[in-house]
């Protein structure tokens, strides 16, 4: 399988059908074999029911993992990583701020340019200044402390990994923000 898309989510019932359709269009247009793994992190809305509907209508491309309560993004990613079968694992948020149209470029960078990890970067943010300013400060500090100088947005949910990266790191607590650093410490270079 070419690509696994892991999508952690909490209360995203309205965006899931559009997100899956968008991903499916991109995958089919590029002839990728793929799976989409939705990890429902204890949603209190009808997200799980929507995932079940997508599973019923998509053949074998949709998988769902359901948490009984909200454990957080790191455990959701970790469980998705454990299930992922694709040679490239892509993560994205379910809120439609990450564009599935970026998947072919992320895939190309992993498979053709030899990167182990590629991170997206939200150049245009649709968040208030009260959120964007602390994010910029966090990213500057994280770059300095981690030594990863060319990563602009540690918090961006859109990332691509070679499968061996996600199979060789443990993500827990709030460590999802530091997956690039964990990968670097595990010996992955590019």
Locations of regions flagged by a protein language model:
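Short aromatic/hydrophobic "clamp" motif used to bind/position activated sugar donors
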Residues: 89
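Short, well-formed alpha-helical segments that are part of the catalytic scaffolds
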Residues: 12-27
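A conserved acidic beta->alpha catalytic loop
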Residues: 40-49, 96-97
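Acceptor/aglycone-binding surface of glycosyltransferases and processive sugar-polymer synthases
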Residues: 53, 63, 67-69, 73-83, ...
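Cell-envelope/extracellular polymer assembly enzymes that use nucleotide-activated donors
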Residues: 2-4, 35
